């Protein structure tokens, strides 16, 4: 059997040559068709496109930048912006605002969805803890998930906020099977 010289062997193209698939910082799956992470950058768009997203939910002080808006428009992705200030020393929103956000998350008409804040940590993390409370997770388990997203998360009172979250939200007409 003839041997092929090392220089003649076919080498697979590099990830960069293929365009690369780069998930957003702190990307993770929350539930089927629900993902979360940090503010997506253009290098993340190819990865996000492969998720078949219906919606990108931005929990940020300002509306999505031009690049993210153009990406959504080009791929038929609904962009929802719910203004939330950057977290500093406390949770940057009210229980009412959190209930509004969770109501969007559990509306099956918006799924598959990617939800993000600026850093994918405090704002998104607290919202996910409140979603987990709605799903009857124990506070300890919900906080453990929060810490996995960023063990260096600042102490802004996330566990206390989620524990006191009343869970009084508007249930949309069509909810995902994973909710309850």
Per-range role (PLM):
Residues 1-114, 119, 126-180:
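Cys-dependent protein tyrosine phosphatase-like superfamily
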């Amino acid at each position: 059997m003839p041997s092929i010289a090392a220089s003649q062997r076919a080498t697979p193209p590099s990830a960069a040559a293929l365009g690369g698939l780069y998930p957003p910082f702190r990307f993770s799956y929350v539930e089927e068709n629900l993902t979360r992470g940090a503010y997506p950058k253009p290098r993340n768009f190819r990865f996000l496109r492969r998720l078949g997203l219906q919606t990108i939910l931005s929990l940020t002080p300002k509306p999505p930048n031009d690049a993210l808006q153009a990406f959504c428009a080009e791929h038929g992705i609904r962009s929802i912006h719910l203004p939330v200030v950057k977290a500093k020393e406390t949770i940057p929103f009210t229980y009412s605002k959190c209930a509004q956000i969770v109501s969007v998350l559990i509306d099956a008409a918006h799924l598959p969805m990617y939800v993000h804040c600026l850093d994918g940590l405090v704002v998104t993390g607290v919202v996910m803890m409140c979603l987990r409370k709605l799903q009857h997770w124990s506070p300890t388990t919900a906080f453990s998930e929060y810490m996995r997203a960023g063990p260096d998360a600042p102490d802004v009172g996330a566990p206390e906020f989620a524990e006191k979250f009343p869970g009084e939200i508007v249930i949309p007409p069509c909810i995902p099977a994973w909710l309850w």
